[in-house]
Regions:
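Acyl-donor (CoA/ACP) binding surface of acyl/acetyltransferases
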Residues: 1-35, 39-44, 74, 78-194
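Conserved GNAT-fold acetyl-CoA-binding loop/helix
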Residues: 45-64
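Juxtamembrane/interface motifs at transmembrane-helix termini
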Residues: 55-58, 68, 107-108
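A generic secondary-structure signal
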Residues: 63-66, 128
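A short helix-loop-beta-strand connector motif used in the catalytic cores of GNAT acetyltransferases and
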Residues: 65-76
Length: 194
């Protein structure tokens, strides 16, 4: 990896992206396409009914371009030991001004599910939200049957704010979602208690 690539990948707004003992965050590059698409394709069963897997090279290219234009914050979750892409997180619809908020989505790929990689990665993503981007609020919308994801945000300190019937169309069906959120004040309280 060139020094230029390393800087683009491991920084956001000129600040280093956070690392944990087992995972670190980095921004995607076009050269990640083969691994990223293969991980998505291998995760079809895991994602069934939750999100369509991203397997189209053109869609991945457009995603990376949006990330590098600053239209969305895309983060790959990579394993420290071998740099494998184990998952990803995205911050979208970032609104500044008096709202200072974003929506967050995330996923872990097969065969890395149920190994607590996202339990380590989510607090790193929250550091990006509240320390690097200096947002006041982040929201995650989760289908009620996605118990592992609900457990993940609960452990991270999110609170349930509401229920949105027929919120998002996935797999040709409108799906209900629970609205989970965290504010900067909640993040400070959670960070102090750990």
């Amino acid at each position: 990896m060139s020094a230029k690539d390393a800087g683009v990948q491991l920084e956001l707004d000129g600040r280093p992206l956070p690392r944990g003992p087992r995972v670190y965050l980095r921004r995607p590059l076009l050269r990640d396409r083969t691994e990223f698409l293969a991980r998505n394709a291998a995760s079809r069963r895991l994602f069934r009914g939750l999100a369509p897997p991203l397997t189209d090279p053109r869609v991945f290219t457009a995603y990376v371009r949006r990330v590098h234009k600053g239209l969305t914050v895309g983060l790959l979750v990579c394993r420290v030991e071998d740099e494998a892409i184990v998952g990803c997180a995205n911050l979208s619809q970032i609104v500044r001004g008096p709202f200072q908020s974003a929506y967050m989505g995330y996923q872990v790929f097969e065969p890395f599910a149920n190994q607590r990689y996202m339990s380590e990665a989510l607090p790193l993503v929250l550091k990006v939200v509240f320390r690097i981007l200096a947002l006041h609020r982040v929201e995650a919308n989760i289908q009620p049957g996605n118990l592992p994801s609900i457990a993940l945000v609960k452990r991270a300190g999110f609170r349930l704010e509401g229920y949105s019937p027929r919120y998002l169309k996935i797999g040709g069906r409108w799906r209900d979602h629970e609205r989970w959120a965290m504010t900067a004040e909640m993040y400070r309280d959670v960070s102090r208690s750990r």
